Amino acid sequence: MEYSIFHCEGGIGKNILATAVVSSLKKSEPKRQIIIVSAWPQVWFNNPDVYQVYQMGQVANFYKNFVKDKDCKIFRQDPYHHQDYILNKKHLIDVWCDLVGAKNDEQGPKLYFSPLELDSIRQKMVNGLTKPIFLLHINGGGPNGNGYSWYRDLPMQNAIDIVNYFKNDYHIYQIGYEKQPLIQGCNKLTLQTREILAAPLFSKKRLFIDSFSHHAAKALSQKSVVCWIGNKPEILGYDGHINIFPDAEPKFDTLHSSYLDDADISGNPIQFPYDRLKIFNSEEIINKLIEL
């Protein structure tokens, strides 16, 4: 048997985006069985392009079964380190496809759920509610990250405006880790990781940032409003979403501590370039959400 070993480091969103790369890789060499090694194997469950999925660090007998004396190709490149990504020349999917030697099939990311799995998630989210669901994700990063990153998180001042506008007519579920603040009027979405990935399917309104939620929504064909600050939708986003940018203009030259990127994604306060905290136009976001 011929194998392609696809090693995917990084977070949930990067893994969801990588499903588009694996789809292209499978089309380029359909006889090869693709094996995924990832910190987030839940993203890859039920994926028809994937032969087996391994949790990173839990790879007993992997070398013996798939590498030693086997016909295998190993793809362990990190597209974040490629100059076409760093210099904002190509979308990350295109950069990654170039690295693995596959043509982008333009299908975009995909997530796969069985009907019974979706029914179970729907019951957890919807049962007992009398209002449609508004799904809100304003803070990115992992479970051990900082509570707030100005580089990609929606400012609390904007988020409160939006919640206050919609809270009487919608049941607002907020996606976030324990350290991240829960806005008054919102309900914490307490589901397992894979269940949260399916949550866009059961929502009427969706407001996201540059985090895994907007990748999941795209993978499920759920048009969403996405707010961008540091990163660019041309590189990490999708045309199908409504992409919104700050109306505040940078006022300070904060590149004194920057290396290959303009700022650290963790949101170092010394790199904040604006002269006000409320950098988005809340009314613009509300109007775009009304259109959904």
Task: Describe the role of every protein-language-model region.
Residues 1-292:
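Catalytic machinery of carbohydrate-active enzymes
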